[in-house]
Design a protein with these regions (language model features):
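Catalytic cores of peptidoglycan-degrading enzymes
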Residues: 30-161
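Polar/charged, compositionally biased leader and regulatory segments
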Residues: 1-44, 158-161
Length: 161
């Protein structure tokens, strides 16, 4: 995702004591949406010009999107490329991105729990049909979500090279 909104400032890293996120809560472990993977992540060593920094999960438009772990919403808004986009900070340098949403249900600085519904699957921004574009970031680097959710390997519709 090339169009990065300025989302990190000192106020976003302050989490109230009564909303502390435990280590086990911040690791993505809840599937964000039931569906099929139509496009996989293309890493930095890919020979493709337009890298794909996450996975696309095809699902019925309007289906609920769940937070993969507890955290604070640091961005909930519109970008040209991702359309309606939600970015959640989970602590321990984890961020998750949920793009092309029909509707964002959460707002900036909302606290979410693992499994909370945060948005609805859509077809906004630069999109070829209803799906969720899902990314995991750790320490400023994009990580393949298939590592965290190997069950998607059984639902992978992408062409093998």
């Amino acid at each position: 995702f090339s169009e990065k909104p300025e989302i990190i400032d000192s106020t976003l890293m302050i989490i109230p004591d009564n909303h502390l996120i435990s280590f086990s809560d911040n690791i993505p472990s809840v599937i964000p949406i039931e569906g099929f993977v139509s496009k996989r992540m293309e890493g930095v060593f890919s020979k493709v010009d337009n890298l794909h920094g996450g996975i696309d999960i095809v699902a019925k438009e309007g289906s609920p999107i769940k937070s993969t772990s507890a955290g604070v919403v640091v961005f909930s808004g519109w970008t040209y490329e991702m359309g309606n986009l939600i970015i959640i900070y989970h602590g321990d340098d984890y961020l998750t991105h949920y793009g092309h949403n029909q509707q964002n249900i959460v707002s900036r600085l909302d606290m979410v729990k693992k499994g909370d519904v945060i948005g609805l699957v859509g077809n906004t921004g630069i999109s070829s049909g209803p799906h969720l574009h899902f990314e995991i970031w750790k320490g400023g680097k994009s990580i393949d979500p298939m590592i965290y959710f190997p069950e998607f390997l059984k639902k992978d519709l992408t062409l093998k090279k």
